[in-house]
């Protein structure tokens, strides 16, 4: 938090005194660089790693406590672990596919939009992850607990999380892309009004963006909860809680790609 405060203060002083990004006359440059690194790379990576582990442990614990049938427990646990491994695999495969596509398209191009290959990577990973989720679930749990519909219901819940991982970057891009009207408004406010107007313009854009992100997450979690109402009554306790965990599981399945895109920064 302290480095981010110094980072923001340093950036504002650059605007006020019209000095360059890494000008030694600005004593906040070191804190600025530290804050940028902490905010764009180290922070998201650490948070992602922690959440990645916590979500997996939470789902495993829930299955052991809420599912009464030992056979169903084992099937769900094996399915969860296989899904985790395959999601990492789809991220790696998507990277190489996207790299080949981007190289063929931009290798000899005079100009390049650096956001385009990142966006295509996110969507390619999400589409591949969804396809793999349904196929593998059908092969692994076609009649879980004697119910032949659970494989696609569980896959659909995970897909809600995967879609969140693809839709949220698009919403973020609306408020952070260099081509965004909101970003251009902040730039104009910074140029014409100085630090105070810059802060106000940024707060407005930030609060507006948070509304759409929250609405998206709420909607997808609502869909997951609705699907969970179709679970057999004897399958587990509190199926909606398990559904919310699977949404987070699907969202974090794109963790490697999300962190890579976040590290690029707007």
Place the predicted regions along the sequence by residue.
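Hydrophobic packing and interface segments
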Residues: 1-266
């Amino acid at each position: 938090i302290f480095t981010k405060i110094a980072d923001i203060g340093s950036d504002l002083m650059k605007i006020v005194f019209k000095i360059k990004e890494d000008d030694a006359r600005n004593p906040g440059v070191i804190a600025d660089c530290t804050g940028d690194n902490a905010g764009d790379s180290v922070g998201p990576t650490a948070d992602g790693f922690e959440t990645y582990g916590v979500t997996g442990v939470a789902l495993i614990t829930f299955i052991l406590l809420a599912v009464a049938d030992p056979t169903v427990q084992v099937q769900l646990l094996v399915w969860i672990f296989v899904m985790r491994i395959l999601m990492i695999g789809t991220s790696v495969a998507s990277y190489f596919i996207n790299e080949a596509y981007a190289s063929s398209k931009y290798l000899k191009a005079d100009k390049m939009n650096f956001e385009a290959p990142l966006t295509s990577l996110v969507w390619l990973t999400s589409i591949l992850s969804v396809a793999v989720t349904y196929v593998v679930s059908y092969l692994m749990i076609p009649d879980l607990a004697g119910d032949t519909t659970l494989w696609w219901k569980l896959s659909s819940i995970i897909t809600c999380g995967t879609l969140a991982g693809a839709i949220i970057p698009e919403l973020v891009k609306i408020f952070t892309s260099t081509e965004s009207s909101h970003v251009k408004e902040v730039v104009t406010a910074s140029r014409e009004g100085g630090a105070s107007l810059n802060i106000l313009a940024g707060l407005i854009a930030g609060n507006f963006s948070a509304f759409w992100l929250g609405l998206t997450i709420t909607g997808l979690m609502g869909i997951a909860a609705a699907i969970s109402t179709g679970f057999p009554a004897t399958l587990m306790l509190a199926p909606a809680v398990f559904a919310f965990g699977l949404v987070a599981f699907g969202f974090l399945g794109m963790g490697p790609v999300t962190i890579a895109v976040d590290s690029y920064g707007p």
